């Protein structure tokens, strides 16, 4: 089968690009013919205040950089390129209404089957006319694959039945790490907050929980690893005001894959104090390194964490509850049993299974 992908791929960084690459690679292993119709430019600078949109990643799969979603003249060129390649299936990566006009134009004109792979239905930030934009982009899809039950419910709540009934429940597979570094025992307990930092991810909640955690575990260390969408000043000020400098280590930058393993190897547990969520690539990354997770029980996060076996779930936006879970994690010595549980479950929900679901 000839399978085309529409959306970001290397050298664009981020979870959407990474997900598409893993899935495309799996299709290639299954002997399908792949073509990536990549973005030439993804966002104008005003919509991406966290700096460079690129990293050093690359792909051996065939890829052409054509689409600039905010430049209409690129839409017809991308459409023609897809049609000339004559795919049997087009998989479009979706996560923001920003792409609705360009995607809608292309998807309603291609002559192959269309699957929208929806990482979100309701965006984390408010967008004017979200329902109208979603309807326009999604109405040409033969199927809409979502990655959590929460996302499927959002689809049914947001769009009319003639579109939402095309929804199919998929899942976010566990990533294959570049290298699985076993946990390295540290001189102090180590928490990890990882990934692109936006307000909805609740880093402020974690920082407010840290003084409570420190009372019980004086030598606790939190590593914050990821670029900030906007300014890091708000978090730096909180760290100073809460007198956390001795307990918090900040790496406010994008971390390439080659460094990721090191941060997980020296961390006891990954913290996801999200205020809202659908699912999270950070969970898939943490599980790939057999790192337990403490996360807010919001959206689809609970679907990927086996409470008290691979991690702990806490109420969202609740620093005392988050602190209590971290303290319990250490007091009850949960790390090693959770690592063993994660290792035993890593062979489920694979990329091969997701690829088969999409083909079927």
Language-model features: locations:
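A conserved mid-protein helix/loop that constitutes part of the nucleotide-sugar donor-binding site
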Residues: 17-22, 198-212, 284, 320
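Donor nucleotide-sugar binding/catalytic pocket of nucleotide-sugar-dependent glycosyltransferases
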Residues: 139-179
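A short, well-ordered alpha-helix in the C-terminal region of glycosyltransferases
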Residues: 219, 334-348
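Conserved donor-binding/catalytic core segment of Leloir-type glycosyltransferases
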Residues: 184-201, 207-210, 223-225
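Acidic donor-binding loop of glycosyltransferase active sites
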Residues: 262-278, 291
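Nucleotide-activated donor-binding/catalytic signature segment of Leloir-type glycosyltransferases, i.e.
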Residues: 235-258
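N-terminal strand-loop element at the rim of the active site
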Residues: 7-13, 24-84, 151, 166, ...
């Amino acid at each position: 089968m000839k399978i085309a992908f529409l959306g970001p791929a290397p050298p664009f960084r981020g979870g959407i690009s990474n997900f598409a690459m893993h899935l495309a690679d799996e299709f290639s292993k299954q002997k399908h013919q792949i073509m990536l119709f990549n973005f030439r430019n993804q966002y104008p600078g005003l919509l991406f205040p966290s700096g460079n949109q690129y990293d050093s990643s690359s792909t051996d799969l065939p890829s052409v950089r054509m689409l600039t979603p905010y430049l209409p003249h690129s839409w017809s060129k991308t459409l023609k390129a897809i049609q000339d390649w004559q795919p049997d299936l087009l998989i479009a990566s979706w996560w923001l209404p920003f792409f609705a006009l360009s995607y809608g134009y292309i998807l309603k004109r291609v002559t192959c089957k269309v699957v929208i792979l929806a990482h979100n239905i309701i965006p984390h930030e408010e967008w004017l006319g979200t329902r109208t934009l979603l309807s326009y982009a999604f109405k040409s899809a033969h199927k809409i694959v979502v990655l959590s039950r929460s996302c499927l419910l959002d689809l049914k709540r947001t769009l009319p039945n003639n579109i939402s009934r095309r929804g199919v429940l998929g899942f976010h597979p566990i990533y294959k790490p570049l290298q699985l570094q076993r946990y390295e025992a540290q001189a102090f307990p180590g928490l990890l907050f990882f990934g692109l930092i936006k307000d909805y991810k609740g880093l402020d909640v974690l920082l407010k929980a840290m003084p409570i955690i420190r009372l019980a575990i004086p030598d606790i260390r939190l590593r914050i690893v990821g670029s900030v969408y906007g300014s890091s000043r708000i978090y730096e000020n909180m760290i100073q005001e809460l007198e956390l400098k001795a307990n918090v280590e900040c790496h406010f930058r994008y971390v390439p894959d080659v460094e990721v393993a090191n941060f997980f190897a020296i961390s006891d547990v990954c913290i996801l104090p999200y205020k809202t969520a659908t699912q999270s690539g950070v969970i898939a990354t943490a599980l790939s390194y057999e790192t337990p997770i403490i996360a807010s029980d919001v959206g689809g996060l609970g679907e990927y964490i086996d409470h008290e076996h691979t991690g702990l779930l806490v109420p969202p936006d609740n620093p005392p509850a988050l602190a209590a879970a971290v303290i319990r994690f250490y007091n009850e010595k949960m790390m090693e049993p959770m690592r063993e549980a994660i290792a035993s479950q890593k062979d489920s929900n694979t990329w091969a299974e997701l690829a088969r679901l999409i083909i079927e």
